[in-house]
Amino acid sequence: MEPVCVKDFTLPELEEWVQGIGERSFRARQLFRHVYGRGVRSWSECSDLSRMFRVQLEHGVELDALSVLKKEQADDGTSKYLFGLRDGHSIEAVLIPDLPRSTLCVSSQVGCALGCKFCLTGSLGFKRNLSAAEIVDQVCQVQRDLGSRSRITNIVFMGMGEPLANLDSVLRAIRVIAEPNGMAFSHRRITLSTAGLVPQLRRLGRESPVNLAVSLHAAENELRAELMPVNRTYPLEVLMAACREYPLPPRKRITFEYILLDGINDDPKQAKQLVKLLHGIRAKVNLMPFNPHPGSVFRKPSEQRVLAFQEALQNARITTHVRRSRGGEIGAACGQLVAEYG
């Protein structure tokens, strides 16, 4: 039997698999509870399974898709996990405590192909997509590390990679994470952030009710294309049309993320352009002062410019928050993930 990873299976797929090896379908629900409820480290811990079934699992089904290579913790409590993959690549995930919430930022790719100019991850280039198991296991491994001390309450696809460029694996991972017989995460507590791959954005709206965040960072095409090459393929008018058509539950809004770059996109004129761009969309805005990293040509704007930009949006009745950097001293802040080991 070719080895498989249990975390690659949705529950219906696992039910089909266990029936294929001669077991009854309810065994799949037992496995989900052991893997995601109890966090077992070995199939031998599953004492309610027959010895023969456990032997089959031990010889053909892997429990983990990745391993923790390194963990760093910042003074503010933010933790960065470096994970090793079986092919030698590595990725990072970040746990951000903000009581009573504890948010895990997960990666969806090794590297990223989009090449956003302000993002250190983009400088790595694209290596490969993650499997569903490699996405799910980031959640499992961090929760295993936390133990009974704390629970992950929110998951955000804002780590390494563009989630919509790996949508098949991301949707499969979300189905596993949200499965009531497993981790039972509410879709309301899962957020996916995208630079704006429009066809995949439309598919996401049809297939998964997770929260949507759009990385915007400029309100006019020329500047956005300079900062984010994806804008040349899907310019703002195309992206915003897709956002206007995106299916939103009552009282839900799309989050628009806007990194403030000193002297680039942070003046009052651009705030007005952003207000105009968001007209007619149920939107909220997260402003993020740039997190400096080695080799970057961009600078963090002054607090005065940040607050002035926020005020301009709030005066237009757009809910606007300033997201303060977390974990910057360990390279865990937004746009800083590079998965270096050493």
From Swiss-Prot:
Keyword tRNA processing in annotation: yes
A Gene Ontology cellular-component term: cytoplasm
Enzyme class: transferase
Positions annotated as active site in the UniProt record: E92 (proton acceptor), C334 (s-methylcysteine intermediate)
Reactions it catalyzes: adenosine(2503) in 23S rRNA + 2 reduced [2Fe-2S]-[ferredoxin] + 2 S-adenosyl-L-methionine = 2-methyladenosine(2503) in 23S rRNA + 5'-deoxyadenosine + L-methionine + 2 oxidized [2Fe-2S]-[ferredoxin] + S-adenosyl-L-homocysteine; adenosine(37) in tRNA + 2 reduced [2Fe-2S]-[ferredoxin] + 2 S-adenosyl-L-methionine = 2-methyladenosine(37) in tRNA + 5'-deoxyadenosine + L-methionine + 2 oxidized [2Fe-2S]-[ferredoxin] + S-adenosyl-L-homocysteine
Residue pairs linked by disulfide bridges in the UniProt entry: C105-C334
Location of the protein in the cell: Cytoplasm
Cofactor: record remark: Binds 1 [4Fe-4S] cluster. The cluster is coordinated with 3 cysteines and an exchangeable S-adenosyl-L-methionine.
Enzyme Commission code(s) on record: 2.1.1.192
Keywords on record: 4Fe-4S, Cytoplasm, Disulfide bond, Iron, Iron-sulfur, Metal-binding, Methyltransferase, rRNA processing, S-adenosyl-L-methionine, Transferase, tRNA processing
Reported cofactor(s): [4Fe-4S] cluster
Designated name of the protein: Dual-specificity RNA methyltransferase RlmN
Organism of derivation: Syntrophobacter fumaroxidans (strain DSM 10017 / MPOB)
Gene name in the database record: rlmN
